[in-house]
């Protein structure tokens, strides 16, 4: 169980935010796990690279981790890969071509998740974020159908995060403002004020309508 000692040492370093040092120990643990029985080591190494914002390497390792699962990947594993692609697209190091490629892959994964678990808001919500990044001025409204689907599900959850609901409603309020449908825009800004009466953006938006 040599790999365990190496793995735990890496985890201690990671807990202290010493991610570069942790990676060295995780990589030693991967080599020591000669039977490939512990793919989670690869996943933890990917996470350490993610924390360093080295997304290409984080994605490379995460894909290796999924391969090691031999088709037994859970939907949560697929979700985390989609999230990695989304984070990579938003990083300062990605050029326009890379950003486009990352967003396409993220969109495909979140589309798959929303099809497999249509009653869960996460697939729609992250697909909305992905399309909002692809359409940063919101002129095409690419994120609109996904924010609408996410919002419809979030509104049925008693414990839904207010910030997630407000993100959906802010996008939709702004979308209708751009379309000059000011009455519909007001509906969403007023909904935000019902959740957060001091919301500065909603107040400013309503003053301008």
List the model feature ranges, each with a label.
Residues 1-179, 204-209:
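Alpha-solenoid helical repeat scaffolds
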Residues 192-193, 199-209:
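Eukaryotic acidic, Ser/Thr-rich intrinsically disordered low-complexity regions
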